[in-house]
Amino acid sequence: MRFLGNSEAKTDAKGRVFLPAVFRKQLQAASQECLILRKDTYQDCLVLYPENVWNEQMNELRCKLNRWNSRHQMIFRQFVSDVEVITLDGNGRFLIPKRYLKLAKIQQDVRFIGLDDTIEIWSKEIADKPFITPEDFGKELEEIMGTNNNVEIE
C-alpha cells in the first residue's frame, strides 16, 4: 500500500476530521480497519500508520533493541508510550486528541500528505510553506540519486 498525494480538511469543534476518501479506499481495499496515530519524531506533524505498517515498525525496532539494556528500553518506551489507536466512524471520521492537535500546532485546517506507507497530518499553515527550497531539493536529490556506484564506465 502506497499513499500518494495530499488533501485538505478541517477539524470540527471536537477535533474530528474526515480521512480523505482516496486514503480511506486504500485502507478498505487492504482490510485495514485500525490506524495508529503518533507525533512525528522530527517534525511538527502527526503520522498515521496502518496497523500492519505499525506492526512492521515495532518488529524492526524491537529487533534492534536489547530488552535488558536500560537505554534501549527508554528509547522503546518513548517510541510507543504516546500513541493512539484510531478507528474511523461510519462517516470516515476520526478524533485527533487535543494533545496531538497542540503538538502539531493544528488549529482547524489540516493537510493530509501520503508518504509512501504512512499518512502525515500537518497544520495547513505549516504545510503551505516549502519543506525545503527548490534549489536545496535539487542538490539533495542529485547527491542521493545522482551517483550510481554500480555503473562501470568504459
From Swiss-Prot:
GO molecular function per UniProt: DNA-binding transcription factor activity; transcription cis-regulatory region binding
The UniProt keyword set, sorted, is: Cytoplasm, DNA-binding, Repeat, Transcription, Transcription regulation
| One GO cellular component term | nucleoid
PROSITE patterns xref list: SPOVT_ABRB
Primary localization: cytoplasm
Subunit architecture: Forms oligomers.
What is this protein identified as? Transcriptional regulator MraZ
